[in-house]
Amino acid sequence: MSHLLTMSELSEQEISEILKDAEDFANGKERKTTEQTFVANLFFENSTRTRFSFEVAEKRLGLEVLDFSADASSVQKGETLYDTIRTLESIGTKAVVIRHEQDRYFDELKDQVNIPILNAGDGCGNHPTQCLLDLLTIKQEFGRFEGLKIAIVGDVRHSRVARSNAEALTKLGATIYFASPEEWKDEENTFGTYKSLDELVPEVDVMMLLRVQHERHDHYETDIMKEYHEQHGLTVEREKRMKEGSIIMHPAPVNRDVEIASELVECERSRIFKQMENGVYVRMAVLKRALPNVLGGMKHELFV
C-alpha cells in the first residue's frame, strides 16, 4: 500500500518517478478515471494551498472528493482518528488525505488501515507534498539538485517544511544551510549547517524562506518579532546582493514585510506562486501513486 507519510520513506528512484509524473501533468498529459472513486480530505488544521490544491488535483483526475469538517463530524463526540478512517474505508473511500496538529499522527494508523494515507502535514513534523512541489520547482529551474546551495531561513524549529526539505535535498546532493534566530534553531535537524543570513545571501542558489509560525510560539518569543524583518528577513537590500540566477521560495502563507519584503513576493527571482501551481501537479502524481489500480502506473528513468 502506497502511504505517503514522510520523505524518509522515499528512495531517490521513487522521488524521481513522482516528479516525472508531476512534470507530465504540468505538460498537459493528464489521465482521468472513469471509475467512480472516492477520496476524503481530513484537515484538522487550517489550510488554503494544501487543501484546495489537493481538491483540484483530485477533481482533475476524475476522483470524487469527500470534504470532511472536523467540527461537523463525530470527532466532536470523541471518535478516534482510527475509527474515522475505518468508517470512511468501510463506506468505500479509497484513500485519505490528512493534516493533523499531532506530530506523526500516522504512526498508530499506518499498519492498521487498509487504504493509503497521504500526509498533508503533521504538527511540526513532516510535509512531504510541500517538499515534493519544492523539489519540482527547483528541478524546473536548475535541471538538477547535485551541487546546489540552498538556504532555509527563519522559523526552523517549528517548520515541518524545513525538516522534509533539508532531508530530501541532502539525499539528492544539495548542500543545505540554515539561518535562524537563536531561539528558533532546531538542533535535531542535522541535515544543514547554520550560518548568518547575510553570509548566505550572495552564496546560495535558492533562498527558501519559512513562515513565522505564531500559533506554535511561546509568549516570550514575541520579542523576536520586533525587528525580525531587518535582522532575519529578506529585505530589498539583501535581495540586491543575491547571486545571479538565484531564486526565492516560500511555502506560504507569506507574512509580507516579515519573512520577505512585500515588493519581493512577485519579483523576478520569486517562484512563490510557481510553487503553488506545482502543488497541483505534485498532488496529482502522489494520488496516482496511491491509487495505481484506478489511475494506472508508469515507470520513469532516474533523472537526479
Swiss-Prot record:
Enzyme class per UniProt: transferase
Catalysed conversion reaction: carbamoyl phosphate + L-aspartate = N-carbamoyl-L-aspartate + phosphate + H(+)
Pathway stated in the Swiss-Prot or TrEMBL entry: Pyrimidine metabolism; UMP biosynthesis via de novo pathway; (S)-dihydroorotate from bicarbonate: step 2/3
Coiled coil (residue ranges): none
Residues noted as binding L-aspartate in the record, renumbered to the chain: 77, 160, 211
Protein's GO biological process: 'de novo' pyrimidine nucleobase biosynthetic process; 'de novo' UMP biosynthetic process; amino acid metabolic process
UniProt function note: Catalyzes the condensation of carbamoyl phosphate and aspartate to form carbamoyl aspartate and inorganic phosphate, the committed step in the de novo pyrimidine nucleotide biosynthesis pathway.
Protein name: Aspartate carbamoyltransferase catalytic subunit
Species of origin: Bacillus mycoides (strain KBAB4)
